[in-house]
């Protein structure tokens, strides 16, 4: 008797592994977004402490450009809003992947439970 798993079980295992990889990628993406959000919020906090006529600069690629406080505050707040939206999107993706993972895990358990025992 062959020790190989049936094609259906192999397929389910491959799908589980793929979902695990997707979940790990989402965790990394979520961490990166959270970090960017914290940086933007910290910049907003520092700008709030500054007088309105303060000279500020912002990074644009390899350049630092002069800007005014109000414009920079608006840009930073929009960035935080966008990052919040991205975090919500990632959270929904995580939920879908987790749900699919649990469903597939149950199917796999059922498939393995129906396999004939290996005898010797």
From Swiss-Prot:
User: One Pfam match, by short name?
Assistant: Prefoldin_2
Which Gene Ontology BP terms does the record give?
chaperone-mediated protein complex assembly; protein folding
Single GO molecular function: unfolded protein binding
* UniProt keyword annotation of Lipid biosynthesis present: no
Q: Which GO terms describe its cellular component?
A: cytoplasm; prefoldin complex
Tell me where it resides. Cytoplasm
Question: Which domain of life, per UniProt?
Answer: Archaea
Per UniProt, the keywords (alphabetical) are: Chaperone, Cytoplasm
- Claim: rRNA-binding is one of the keywords in the record: no
Q: Which CDD domains match?
A: Prefoldin_beta_GimC
Q: Self-association or partners: how does it assemble?
A: Heterohexamer of two alpha and four beta subunits.
Similarity remark: Belongs to the prefoldin subunit beta family.
Function comment: Molecular chaperone capable of stabilizing a range of proteins. Seems to fulfill an ATP-independent, HSP70-like function in archaeal de novo protein folding.
Q: Which protein are we looking at? A: Prefoldin subunit beta
**Gene that this polypeptide is encoded by:** pfdB
